[in-house]
Swiss-Prot record:
Keyword Repeat annotated: yes
Originating species: Scaptomyza albovittata (Fruit fly)
Disordered as annotated region, ranges: 14-93, 124-171
Bias kind Basic residues: ranges: 17-31
Task of the protein: Gap class segmentation protein that controls development of head structures.
Protein known as: Protein hunchback
GO MF term (any one): zinc ion binding
Sequence ranges of Basic and acidic residues compositional bias: 152-171
One GO term describing the cellular component: nucleus
First-listed, main subcellular location of the protein, grouped into a coarse class: nucleus
Any Gene Ontology biological process: segmentation
Keyword Kinase part of the UniProt annotation: no
Subcellular location: Nucleus
Superkingdom of origin: Eukaryota
Amino acid sequence: WYSSMFAANIKEEPMSHHHHHSHHSHGHHHSNSNSNASSPRQSPLPSPNPPSSSNLHLEQYLKQQQQHQQQQQQPMDTPLPLTPPGLPNPMQIIMPANMRPATQPTPTIATPTTTSSAIVALQSNDKLQALTPPMDVTPPKSAAKSQQSWAEPEKDHDLMSNSSEDMKYMA
């Protein structure tokens, strides 16, 4: 798109590019038509600038439209528009779990609600784990379980390697 915009700008408003490409545009305009080279210089600001700005805006507008169309097509292809932008991992984890039971003819309607609630649950779990006062019930249990399961193999390993030091730590 840049080359086409560049060519359009040179054709419709050669004055702005005279500064950048003074030699090239100067020679080409004189060889092609002297009127084109002389008229923009006489009225540089009023005539060439409006087409340049309109061209730029049209180009940007077209690009934005194309981007929006692509963005609109993506959520239609992926039935979960909520998950891809912010939380790709939960989508990958939740998608198979939800798609297996949701074998109804309308999975796209069933999955967004479940995934949004699951994402909210994931976010709330993360927040609670980060804060840990509301979840005081579960972290101690999990920590105790992990410590116990962690200590049992360590005891065996410690008795094998150097029992005196490690038994002091375990006691």
